[in-house]
Amino acid sequence: PGSPQKRAASPRKSPRKGSPKKSPMIRAAITAMRERKGSSVAKIKSYIAANYRVNMTNLQPHIRRALRSGVASGALKQVTGTGATGRFRVG
């Protein structure tokens, strides 16, 4: 019989619009709070929960990773604690 028919090209999906990047959210939280000793992780999380529409249970490991990478890159300065605990300031 005949040759196989070609399938119609499927329409391209638009890129998924998820939550904003974590590091700008953390930087915005720290600068908005303007705490003298630096901002604690709990305060940063509560600021993000209050000001962004995000699911905090899914976001917590991403916040920890963003804090560690921010300290490693020099964008954030860790005043007290180690890892993703303690208090943080902007670079």
Swiss-Prot record:
Residue segments, region Disordered: 1-25
Organism for this UniProt entry: Sphaerechinus granularis (Purple sea urchin)
Gene Ontology cellular-component terms listed: nucleosome; nucleus
Recorded superkingdom: Eukaryota
Similarity field: Belongs to the histone H1/H5 family.
Transmembrane intervals: none
Molecular function via GO: double-stranded DNA binding; nucleosomal DNA binding; structural constituent of chromatin
SUPFAM superfamilies reported for this sequence: Winged helix' DNA-binding domain
Residues of the H15 domain: 18-91
GO biological process, one term: negative regulation of DNA recombination
InterPro entries the record matches: H1/H5 (IPR005819), Histone_H1/H5_H15 (IPR005818), WH-like_DNA-bd_sf (IPR036388), WH_DNA-bd_sf (IPR036390)
Record key words, sorted: Chromosome, DNA-binding, Nucleus
A Pfam entry, by short name: Linker_histone
Compositionally biased residues, Basic residues: 9-20
Biological role: Histones H1 are necessary for the condensation of nucleosome chains into higher-order structures.
Keyword Nucleotide-binding listed: no
Endpoints of the signal sequence: none
Protein name: Histone H1, sperm
Subcellular location, record wording: Nucleus; Chromosome
